[in-house]
Amino acid sequence: MTASLVGRTSTAVFALGLAFAGNSIATSLSGPRLGLIFDRSGGSLRPISGIPGAATTGQALDLGFKISGAEISPAQDAALVVNARNSSVALIRASGGDWVAASLDGVQPGPDMMAYSPGGSAAALYYAAGRVQILTGLAGAPSIAGELDVSTLPSPVTAMAVNDAGSFVLMAAGQAGAVSLYRVAAGSAPGLVASFRSVSSVRLFNAGQQALVTDTLAATVYQVTDSAGVAAIQVIASEGDGIQGLIAADTDAAGQRVFAAVGSGTVFIFDRSGGPPAAIACACAPTGLFRLAGGATFSLTELAAGPLEVLDANSAPRMVAVPPPVQAAPLPGGHR
């Protein structure tokens, strides 16, 4: 796999012609930033500069092509993107003051699902044909660490997580009402971990020893411990805690607090050591919990006509808004 400075060269695999080496991009990387966000309607990535309460959404990064999908690293310094034209996969990452594109030789086009590891060093790409490609070294020299056969899993696959070493993947699969969580590693058949009514997300934490499983049908958030052996299942939050209409759940970077967003616009915050949950209202209809930079910063909404609604729980929890981007087409060379 080769890396090139986008904007100064173009890779043969993606013919990117990216324009990120200009001063405007270097400037955008020089100050504090909350990370990247996928602009689904615009088919692009946009940077969010600043800090919670004083942040702005920047202009679309000029990739040279539209993207149909993106998985952003938890470190907010890289993203795997899918080219909308030919379904090829590219790695876009920050390096110094520039954005760099790495050509991912051997990576199959058209993944149906992508997932970064908690630390951003590895990723898993799932294909509906029944295979998973594991990428490692994403912070340095990316490589394909292996490929897993998951053709025996029921369909559809609803969620996936991979550990930082890329040594195993957790996959949720099955029809609504009967979804099972499996542990998949090279050289062994998928092993059943537990079964749920539904699984909309799986998040690994505590060095991959524990997983947070979100079951929206049951309005329950579970903690699964030691998925490599006999799994211990613990309920972190349930309907009785007020999370009816559960949309999404995630942990802070330390894995100590669990955040659960519900459709009414409330985010409940649970401490895994116990005690009653805290609650904070969002003047929005949450569509998910999209991690941003910082130990406990999440966007509750995606880019649309209005501002991004962001939960900042790095100290006293609060909701802040990030204004929508000013519409302007990116120009080659990073100049506008």
Q: Predicted regions span which residues?
A:
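Bacterial N-terminal signal peptides that target proteins for export
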Residues: 1-12
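Short loop/turn segments that connect beta-strands within beta-propeller blades
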Residues: 50-53, 93-97, 137-140, 184-188, ...
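Short beta-strand elements that form the blades of beta-propeller/WD-repeat-like
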Residues: 33-39, 77-83, 121-126, 167-172, ...
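Bacterial N-terminal signal peptides
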Residues: 10-21
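A short beta-strand motif characteristic of beta-propeller blades
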Residues: 55-65, 99-106, 143-151, 188-194, ...
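Repeated scaffold domains used in trafficking and secretory/extracellular systems
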Residues: 65-75, 106-120, 152-162, 197-208, ...
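An edge-strand/N-cap motif at the start of beta-rich repeat modules
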Residues: 26-54
